[in-house]
């Protein structure tokens, strides 16, 4: 299960006691969750007004950064065109898997110096992730165009004889070329009607060259045949052929055009291969950057919310729980019993779906302790 609950509770005599109490209640005694301390450094608190405003801004930033993390992960899956396991291998944070990164979280002092104000740190994160989002849009657009153009050409060379490009199938010898009077047509003949074609093609119109038809290719349902006739009989031949379920394809043998199409396909294929490696590398690096930023936003939110709820001086313990799916309800009840004394408004039914005025959270998401969910299930496989 890739869901974490990031919570905080006020320090008792010491923060260590708070941690030991939670660990005993959730992990040690009954194995409801895997629990670990979540280390948040001593950040600059600032004024109450700033904290209240920042609380709303961080909620928006959290949603934005999570969206970018998911976009980068999903695009990685699209680019790799591969199995879920292969994608997961590439979704790392700081070179380790996501669970390891979260459970061993250490604040990045170099990226987000704690001497800066909370607002400045949130702005540094917002700026960095916005840049990733913009870069992703432009890189994805360029790669998707390339991929789309290549797929269009590949699609032309696939499908039935009625629709696919015939350039790869026919040869110069299959045509009478450079004749003032004669022309070679390509006709798709249903296999069920092939005997009728053999008997009729010479008489479908005047001036058809006898014994000029050969089978050039076939698919599941049809044969591709050529036939040579005088140019002035072409319209009449087309009309009569259609009446007999023989379809004349619009095709002119042009070596220059065919060569250009082939070169274009080779060029697009080469370009795609050239771009693939650097793009995957960029996605790996920037997924890591965005994910790290996201967990720092979660840390900021816990810090700000804990100060707003539990007051000053700063005295709280942040803790990370990885719940067992089958015992999530029981875990909620245990946490409620541990911390219900913190907030009388949460003493109602734990999961009542009621709105609390002045809060962005419904009652379902409001608990007497600070709580944020981290969902690492980032991919939506179709």
From Swiss-Prot:
Subcellular localization(s) per the UniProt record: Cytoplasmic vesicle, Secretory vesicle, Synaptic vesicle membrane; Cytoplasmic vesicle, Clathrin-coated vesicle membrane
Tissue occurrence: Expressed in brain (at protein level).
GO BP terms, alphabetized: pH reduction; proton transmembrane transport; synaptic vesicle lumen acidification
Annotated InterPro entries: ATPase_V1-cplx_csu, Vac_ATP_synth_c_sf
Residues where N-acetylthreonine is found: 2
Gene Ontology CC: clathrin-coated vesicle membrane; plasma membrane; synaptic vesicle membrane; vacuolar proton-transporting V-type ATPase, V1 domain
Alphabetical UniProt keywords: Acetylation, Cytoplasmic vesicle, Hydrogen ion transport, Ion transport, Membrane, Synapse, Transport
One Pfam family matching this protein: V-ATPase_C
Domain of life: Eukaryota
Presence of keyword Transport: yes
GO molecular function (one): proton-transporting ATPase activity, rotational mechanism
Entry keyword annotation includes Magnesium: no
Membrane topology according to the record: Peripheral membrane protein
SUPFAM superfamilies linked: Vacuolar ATP synthase subunit C
Functional note: Subunit of the V1 complex of vacuolar(H+)-ATPase (V-ATPase), a multisubunit enzyme composed of a peripheral complex (V1) that hydrolyzes ATP and a membrane integral complex (V0) that translocates protons. V-ATPase is responsible for acidifying and maintaining the pH of intracellular compartments and in some cell types, is targeted to the plasma membrane, where it is responsible for acidifying the extracellular environment. Subunit C is necessary for the assembly of the catalytic sector of the enzyme and is likely to have a specific function in its catalytic activity.
Family: Belongs to the V-ATPase C subunit family.
Record note on quaternary structure: V-ATPase is a heteromultimeric enzyme made up of two complexes: the ATP-hydrolytic V1 complex and the proton translocation V0 complex. The V1 complex consists of three catalytic AB heterodimers that form a heterohexamer, three peripheral stalks each consisting of EG heterodimers, one central rotor including subunits D and F, and the regulatory subunits C and H. The proton translocation complex V0 consists of the proton transport subunit a, a ring of proteolipid subunits c9c'', rotary subunit d, subunits e and f, and the accessory subunits ATP6AP1/Ac45 and ATP6AP2/PRR.
Protein name: V-type proton ATPase subunit C 1
Lineage: Eukaryota, Metazoa, Chordata, Craniata, Vertebrata
